[in-house]
């Protein structure tokens, strides 16, 4: 089994790790830094090269976690699925749940210096989408676009953390802050509660598109939707970091 630490931001390279964890560096090599939006998915060839360098084989089982709980680990899980790899699971509650259970940790950041793996990227079209696909979904009565940002950012009453972005949301998008899918102890809520949270906004619509600030917490919604039994889901890779740039793409301010 391969265990990945997918922590980002202040938690990246933290002081403790699950024993044997390897770095899934979303702030580093596992994002395309030539793209205008942060955390953009790298090319299939680049992703494959990094995963091989981390010793992952096509037959391995993978578990991803992060030090914040349920946060960036969902992005790592979704990226692996986008690249055709399904033998991957998210550690519920992440490192906080692991340590709360009294399980062992090692000091220092996640590292890997072992042999290369044989991972093969097999990209799946449709799981990760661009702005044009989201615009089409907003006009499709059979689809719904859900925004994982806070209610204040969605309404435009709180500033965006990334300079230069407009406040507000896409016309027709609905707000489901990702934290509302997380229950006591930092664990994902039960499947029935997750389904109810999605149905409260989507109704009978089964085709769900997810957005957030930079494509990370949108994947928490994707994880929740998968646990709730939804099969037609997609993540907007650029998310608000792209849509919110000064452009002619429409923005709504307010609830």
Report each predicted region and the residues it spans:
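Cytosolic catalytic domains that perform sulfur/thiol-centered chemistry
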Residues: 1-255
């Amino acid at each position: 089994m391969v265990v990945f630490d997918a922590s980002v931001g202040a938690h990246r390279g933290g002081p403790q790790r699950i024993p044997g964890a390897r770095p899934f560096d979303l702030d580093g090599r596992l994002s395309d830094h030539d793209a205008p939006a942060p955390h953009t998915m790298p090319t299939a060839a680049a992703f494959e090269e990094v995963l091989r360098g981390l010793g992952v084989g096509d037959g391995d089982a993978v578990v991803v976690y992060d030090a914040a709980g349920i946060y960036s680990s969902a992005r790592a899980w979704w990226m692996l699925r986008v690249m055709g790899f399904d033998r991957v699971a998210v550690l519920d509650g992440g490192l906080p749940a692991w340590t709360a259970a009294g399980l062992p940790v090692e000091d220092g950041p996640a590292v890997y210096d072992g042999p290369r793996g044989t991972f093969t990227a097999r990209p799946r079209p449709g799981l990760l989408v661009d702005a044009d696909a989201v615009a089409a979904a907003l006009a499709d009565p059979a689809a719904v676009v859900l925004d994982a940002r806070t209610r204040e950012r969605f309404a435009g009453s709180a500033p965006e953390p990334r300079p230069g972005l407009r406040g507000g949301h896409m016309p027709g998008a609905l707000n489901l802050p990702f934290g509302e899918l997380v229950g006591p102890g930092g664990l994902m809520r039960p499947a029935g509660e997750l389904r109810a949270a999605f149905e409260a906004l989507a109704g009978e619509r089964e085709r769900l598109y997810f957005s957030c600030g930079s494509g990370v917490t949108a994947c928490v919604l994707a994880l929740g939707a998968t646990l709730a039994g939804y099969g037609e889901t997609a993540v907007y890779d650029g998310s608000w970091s792209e849509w919110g740039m000064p452009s002619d793409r429409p923005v709504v301010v307010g609830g």
